[in-house]
Amino acid sequence: MNTDIDYTGIRPDRKSDEPLHIQLHRALVREIRSLPPNRHVALMSERELAIRLNLSRRTTHRAYEQLLEDRLVRRRPDKSLMVRQDARSRMLGPYPVIGVLIPMDFSQFVQNNGRNAVPYLEGLIGCSSGLNASCIMLRSPEASASPAEIEAFAAEHFPRLCGVIHLGGLSRFNTPCDPVLEQLLKHTEIPQVCISGSLPEDHVGSVCADPAQGLDEMCQVLKERGFRRVGVIGRKFEPQLFHYIAEERSSAMCDALTRNGLECVLRADLPDTGTGAAVEAILTRPDRPEVLLCHNDKTADLVWRTARSMGLRIPDDLALAGYDCRPGDPRLASIMTSPGDIASAAVEMVMDHFRNGISDANRLRLLPTKFVDGKSLYKPGVHKRNIKKNRT
C-alpha cells in the first residue's frame, strides 16, 4: 500500500464526457483506499492540486467538497484537509462486497473444474454471508482485451468492492503471459488474495493448504506398515504468473519422505498427453517402488486402472495414495486439504486486509492438511486393521 497520496497516477481525461471534478473525486477515493489504515495523511491544497493537474480551482474545490460530504476527509483549523482515520471503515459500509475473479462464464467454470470448484465456492459464499457480506463472481476480460478495456473493467467493479479473490490465473492457455491478471495486480487500492497459490506482489495475500502435516502422518503409517521404497508421481506445470501451490507438491512429498526416513526411489512427472503410456512405463520398471504417491486422486485413479489392466492388484502388488481426498471413497488413501476452510480463510483475509492493511504478519495463511487412510495402503500379511470411513 502507498504511504501517501500518489498524485502522479491522477490523470483526468478532458476528452471524456464525465465531468472533471467527478473523475478527480474518484481518483482521490482510489488513492485514499490505497493508504494504510489509520494513517494521518494531509491532502494537497486545492490551489496546488489545480496547478499540478492543470485544472481549474473550481474543479479541485468541487472534488474536495465531495470528499468532505463523503466524510472521508476532515478540515483542520488551518483549513487544510486530512484523511479521516475511519475513512476505510466508511468505504466498507454495512454490506461489504467481495469479488471473485473467474476467466470464463460461471457455468462453464464450474463444469470445467467440477469437483474442485464447488467446495471452494461453498466456502466463499458461506463465510461471506456469515460476515454479512456478499460474494459475487466477476468474469474477467478476455486475454485479448486492450489495456483500456481492462481498466474499464476495474473502474466498473473495484470501487464497490472491499477486496478481490483469485482462484487462479485468468488466461485460458497454459502460458506465462496473463495480461489481464498482470494489469489488475497494479490496483493496490483494493486487497487481493489468492486461494491455493500466490502472485509476485507484496500487496497480495495467499491462503494455502500446508501439505507437511498430512504427508508426515502418511509417512508414519507407511513406516508402521513396513514400507520403505516409495515413488512420487507428479505432473508437469508450465510457468505461469499465478503460482499454484500444487506445483510444489511433488517436492513436498519427496521432502516428507526424506524427513521421515523413507527412501524416494522414483520421481516422475506425467506429461499432459500420453499419460497412460507414461504410467505403464512406471509400472513395468524392474525396480518399481512398493508405494506410489500420486499428485492427486485423479492421477491415483489412473494408476489404479492401468495397474488393473496389467494384472497388478492394489494393494497386494502395489500400494497407492492420492492427494485432495475425494469424498466417499474409502479405498484410496489420500491427503485432505479442506477447500471450504481455505476459501473461508480467504474471505476473512480480505476483510482483515481492508480494515488493517497487509503486512508480513497477515500476508500468508497456511491451513493444516490431514491424512485419510484407505485400503490402497493396506499391506497384506503385515497389518490387519479396518480402514475407517472417515471421509466427509
Which sequence ranges carry the predicted segments?
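An alpha-beta-alpha
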Residues: D216-L262, L266-R267, S359-Y378
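Amphipathic helical "hinge" segments at domain boundaries
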Residues: E18, I22-V29, S34, N38, ...
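Hydrophobic alpha-helical segments within soluble ligand-binding/sensing domains
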Residues: H203-I233, T273-A281, T337-N356
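Flexible loop/hinge segments that line or gate small-molecule binding clefts
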Residues: L170-Q213, K298, D324-A333
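Flexible loop/turn connectors
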Residues: G276-T392
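Periplasmic-binding protein-like
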Residues: G99-L101, F158-S171, G231-G234, R267, ...
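Short, Lys/Arg-rich nucleic-acid/phosphate-binding segment
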Residues: A42-E48, R75-R88
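Extreme N-terminal segment that seeds HTH/winged-HTH DNA-binding domains in transcriptional regulators
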Residues: M1-L55, R62-E65, R115, A155, ...
